[in-house]
Protein backbone atom coordinates (compact mmCIF):
# COMPACT_ATOMS: atom_id res chain seq x y z
CA UNK A 1 0.00 0.00 0.00
CA UNK A 2 1.20 3.49 -0.77
CA UNK A 3 1.80 5.12 2.61
CA UNK A 4 2.54 8.67 1.41
CA UNK A 5 -0.01 11.31 2.34
CA UNK A 6 0.01 15.08 2.28
CA UNK A 7 0.17 15.31 6.05
CA UNK A 8 2.90 12.70 6.29
CA UNK A 9 4.79 14.57 3.59
CA UNK A 10 4.41 17.84 5.49
CA UNK A 11 5.70 16.33 8.69
CA UNK A 12 8.63 14.71 6.90
CA UNK A 13 9.72 17.84 5.04
CA UNK A 14 8.54 20.84 7.06
CA UNK A 15 11.83 22.57 6.37
CA UNK A 16 11.43 22.63 2.60
CA UNK A 17 8.69 25.14 1.85
CA UNK A 18 7.42 28.43 3.21
CA UNK A 19 4.38 30.59 4.04
CA UNK A 20 1.10 29.06 5.26
CA UNK A 21 -0.22 26.80 2.51
CA UNK A 22 -1.85 24.42 4.96
CA UNK A 23 -3.69 25.10 8.20
CA UNK A 24 -4.06 23.20 11.47
CA UNK A 25 -6.40 24.25 14.27
CA UNK A 26 -4.98 23.31 17.67
CA UNK A 27 -6.67 22.50 20.96
CA UNK A 28 -4.53 22.00 24.07
CA UNK A 29 -5.21 20.92 27.65
CA UNK A 30 -2.47 20.86 30.32
CA UNK A 31 -2.26 17.53 32.15
CA UNK A 32 -1.91 18.09 35.90
CA UNK A 33 -1.13 15.37 38.45
CA UNK A 34 -0.27 15.98 42.13
CA UNK A 35 0.19 19.70 41.50
CA UNK A 36 2.72 18.95 38.78
CA UNK A 37 2.59 19.59 35.06
CA UNK A 38 3.04 16.17 33.46
CA UNK A 39 2.18 16.91 29.84
CA UNK A 40 -0.37 18.21 27.39
CA UNK A 41 -3.36 16.69 25.64
CA UNK A 42 -3.56 17.97 22.06
CA UNK A 43 -5.98 17.86 19.15
CA UNK A 44 -4.86 18.96 15.70
CA UNK A 45 -7.60 19.48 13.09
CA UNK A 46 -6.36 19.68 9.50
CA UNK A 47 -7.89 21.88 6.82
CA UNK A 48 -10.03 20.15 4.20
CA UNK A 49 -7.39 19.85 1.42
CA UNK A 50 -4.84 18.33 3.79
CA UNK A 51 -7.51 16.12 5.35
CA UNK A 52 -8.70 14.76 2.01
CA UNK A 53 -5.25 13.43 1.15
CA UNK A 54 -4.91 11.64 4.48
CA UNK A 55 -8.48 10.30 4.41
CA UNK A 56 -7.80 8.92 0.92
CA UNK A 57 -4.72 7.07 2.16
CA UNK A 58 -6.65 5.74 5.15
CA UNK A 59 -9.30 4.36 2.81
CA UNK A 60 -6.60 2.63 0.77
CA UNK A 61 -5.46 0.81 3.90
CA UNK A 62 -7.17 -2.55 3.71
CA UNK A 63 -6.36 -3.83 7.17
CA UNK A 64 -6.34 -2.44 10.68
CA UNK A 65 -2.59 -3.01 10.80
CA UNK A 66 -2.03 -0.90 7.67
CA UNK A 67 -4.12 1.94 9.10
CA UNK A 68 -2.20 1.74 12.36
CA UNK A 69 1.10 1.90 10.47
CA UNK A 70 -0.02 5.09 8.72
CA UNK A 71 -0.87 6.65 12.06
CA UNK A 72 2.36 5.42 13.66
CA UNK A 73 4.41 6.85 10.77
CA UNK A 74 2.84 10.29 11.14
CA UNK A 75 3.18 10.27 14.93
CA UNK A 76 6.79 9.17 14.59
CA UNK A 77 7.55 12.19 12.45
CA UNK A 78 5.72 14.51 14.82
CA UNK A 79 7.74 13.14 17.74
CA UNK A 80 11.00 13.51 15.80
CA UNK A 81 10.22 17.23 15.49
CA UNK A 82 9.65 17.60 19.25
CA UNK A 83 5.89 17.65 18.61
CA UNK A 84 6.41 21.07 16.96
CA UNK A 85 5.91 22.36 20.51
CA UNK A 86 8.38 24.35 22.57
CA UNK A 87 7.98 24.51 26.35
CA UNK A 88 10.05 26.65 28.73
CA UNK A 89 10.03 27.18 32.49
CA UNK A 90 10.47 30.38 34.54
CA UNK A 91 14.25 30.28 34.05
CA UNK A 92 13.78 29.88 30.29
CA UNK A 93 15.02 26.29 30.44
CA UNK A 94 13.69 24.17 27.59
CA UNK A 95 11.64 21.28 28.91
CA UNK A 96 11.93 17.95 27.15
CA UNK A 97 9.10 15.62 26.20
CA UNK A 98 8.89 11.87 26.32
CA UNK A 99 9.46 10.29 22.88
CA UNK A 100 6.43 8.07 23.50
CA UNK A 101 3.08 9.82 22.93
CA UNK A 102 0.05 8.36 24.66
CA UNK A 103 -3.60 7.87 23.74
CA UNK A 104 -3.13 8.85 20.10
CA UNK A 105 -5.54 8.30 17.25
CA UNK A 106 -7.58 9.84 14.43
CA UNK A 107 -11.10 11.24 14.20
CA UNK A 108 -12.87 12.23 10.98
CA UNK A 109 -15.25 15.16 11.44
CA UNK A 110 -17.13 15.75 8.22
CA UNK A 111 -14.48 16.56 5.62
CA UNK A 112 -11.77 17.24 8.18
CA UNK A 113 -9.38 14.93 9.93
CA UNK A 114 -8.27 15.36 13.51
CA UNK A 115 -5.23 13.86 15.20
CA UNK A 116 -5.40 13.57 18.97
CA UNK A 117 -2.58 12.59 21.33
CA UNK A 118 -1.11 13.18 24.77
CA UNK A 119 2.41 14.61 25.01
CA UNK A 120 4.03 13.46 28.28
CA UNK A 121 6.91 15.47 29.69
CA UNK A 122 10.16 13.58 30.18
CA UNK A 123 10.02 14.68 33.82
CA UNK A 124 7.04 16.18 35.72
CA UNK A 125 7.42 19.87 36.54
CA UNK A 126 6.39 21.42 39.85
CA UNK A 127 3.75 24.09 39.35
CA UNK A 128 4.27 26.04 42.57
CA UNK A 129 6.17 29.31 42.05
CA UNK A 130 6.81 28.49 38.42
CA UNK A 131 5.85 29.88 35.03
CA UNK A 132 5.61 27.93 31.79
CA UNK A 133 5.34 29.12 28.20
CA UNK A 134 4.29 26.84 25.35
CA UNK A 135 4.30 27.55 21.62
CA UNK A 136 3.31 25.13 18.87
CA UNK A 137 4.34 26.01 15.34
CA UNK A 138 6.02 24.97 12.10
CA UNK A 139 9.37 26.81 12.08
CA UNK A 140 9.13 27.48 8.32
CA UNK A 141 5.51 28.72 8.55
CA UNK A 142 4.56 26.47 5.63
CA UNK A 143 1.78 25.21 7.90
CA UNK A 144 -0.08 27.69 10.09
CA UNK A 145 -0.79 26.05 13.45
CA UNK A 146 -3.21 28.20 15.42
CA UNK A 147 -5.72 28.31 18.25
CA UNK A 148 -8.97 29.53 16.71
CA UNK A 149 -10.10 31.10 19.99
CA UNK A 150 -9.07 31.40 23.63
CA UNK A 151 -11.43 28.53 24.46
CA UNK A 152 -9.19 26.22 22.40
CA UNK A 153 -6.94 26.08 25.47
CA UNK A 154 -8.56 24.37 28.46
CA UNK A 155 -7.09 25.58 31.75
CA UNK A 156 -9.77 23.97 33.95
CA UNK A 157 -7.33 21.42 35.41
CA UNK A 158 -5.12 24.14 36.90
CA UNK A 159 -5.18 24.57 40.66
CA UNK A 160 -6.33 27.82 42.31
CA UNK A 161 -2.77 29.11 42.65
CA UNK A 162 -2.30 29.01 38.86
CA UNK A 163 -3.56 31.14 36.01
CA UNK A 164 -3.45 30.43 32.30
CA UNK A 165 -3.75 32.68 29.30
CA UNK A 166 -3.27 32.66 25.53
CA UNK A 167 -1.19 35.48 24.07
CA UNK A 168 -1.51 36.54 20.44
CA UNK A 169 1.65 37.38 18.46
CA UNK A 170 2.43 40.94 17.46
CA UNK A 171 3.80 40.51 13.94
CA UNK A 172 5.47 43.40 12.15
CA UNK A 173 3.74 44.40 8.89
CA UNK A 174 6.97 43.87 6.95
CA UNK A 175 7.21 40.30 8.23
CA UNK A 176 3.58 39.67 7.27
CA UNK A 177 4.22 41.03 3.78
CA UNK A 178 7.34 38.88 3.44
CA UNK A 179 5.46 35.74 4.47
CA UNK A 180 2.62 36.54 2.07
CA UNK A 181 5.08 36.95 -0.80
CA UNK A 182 6.35 33.38 -0.50
CA UNK A 183 4.77 30.66 -2.60
CA UNK A 184 4.94 26.88 -2.53
CA UNK A 185 7.94 26.73 -4.86
CA UNK A 186 10.13 28.98 -2.73
CA UNK A 187 12.40 27.71 0.00
CA UNK A 188 12.47 29.45 3.33
CA UNK A 189 16.03 29.21 4.59
CA UNK A 190 15.15 31.11 7.77
CA UNK A 191 13.49 28.79 10.27
CA UNK A 192 12.71 31.74 12.54
CA UNK A 193 9.60 32.75 10.56
CA UNK A 194 7.16 30.38 12.25
CA UNK A 195 7.85 31.48 15.81
CA UNK A 196 7.02 35.09 14.87
CA UNK A 197 3.44 34.04 14.07
CA UNK A 198 3.07 31.61 16.98
CA UNK A 199 0.58 32.14 19.77
CA UNK A 200 1.86 31.52 23.28
CA UNK A 201 0.27 29.69 26.19
CA UNK A 202 1.33 31.02 29.60
CA UNK A 203 0.79 29.09 32.83
CA UNK A 204 1.78 31.12 35.90
CA UNK A 205 1.61 29.71 39.41
CA UNK A 206 2.17 31.27 42.83
From Swiss-Prot:
UniProt entry keywords in alphabetical sequence: Signal
Annotated signal peptide: 1-18
Pfam family, one: DUF1007
InterPro entries to which the protein is assigned, alphabetical: DUF1007 (IPR010412), UCP008159_ABC (IPR016537)
Domain of life: Bacteria
UniProt name for this protein: Uncharacterized protein HI_1249
Organism in which the protein naturally occurs: Haemophilus influenzae (strain ATCC 51907 / DSM 11121 / KW20 / Rd)
Amino acid sequence: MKTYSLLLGLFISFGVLAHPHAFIDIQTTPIIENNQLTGFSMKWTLDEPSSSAVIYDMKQARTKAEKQKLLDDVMGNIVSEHYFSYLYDAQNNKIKYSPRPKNYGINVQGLQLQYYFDVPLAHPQKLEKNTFSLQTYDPTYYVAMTYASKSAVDFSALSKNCQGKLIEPNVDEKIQAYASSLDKSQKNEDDSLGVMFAQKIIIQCE
